[in-house]
Amino acid sequence: MRYTLSLERITLSDYQQLLLKQNLLPGRRILLEQLEARFAMLCDQGLTTVAQLAAALSSPNKLSSLAAATGIPEEYLTILRRELGSLSQKPVPLSDFPACSPAQIRSLAEESIRTSKEYWERGGATQDELFSLCDLVRINGVGAVAARAFYEAGYSSVAAVANAAAAGMLKRVSAVNAEKSYYKAKLGEKDMQFCIDYAKLLVAYS
């Protein structure tokens, strides 16, 4: 199992469904315009996985060539390339996690383990609270603070989130945040559902 998604294993159909459920930034909602038709055009070019799509958009020349071949506007493909970049979560510094033992963080730093990825990959028998937090930040959009709220709400792993129901998860996470004030953002069921769907991708494709 890998820390991040194996983009080679995610089909364009899977990614299309993820986009439909995601709470996209305002500047990226253009991706939902003619989504099904445009993804069908991409498939017609022999692109079947997210890795292949990312490679086809990896340079301005390749992007322009794909736009010419499909008739999809370059602006659309440029924004799609940016959104694809968000599939790979950047590791979180262990020191960013709230309410963790400073002594443990210092001890790990002495072993050159400073990020969520490094601690998660060490794995083994050390599947403690910190490991759970490192697992949770593998989910797209979940940072150190949200991971703490998820953990205290009873979701201690990617698998637990993948098996959650959005309404119930929102209720439990919101209750934790109301008590602890971990974050200021107002989250809704759609945000929880996106986390659940992304967690399912991690379970299936990491």
Q: What do these predicted ranges mean?
A:
Residues 1-56, 60-206:
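C-terminal extensions
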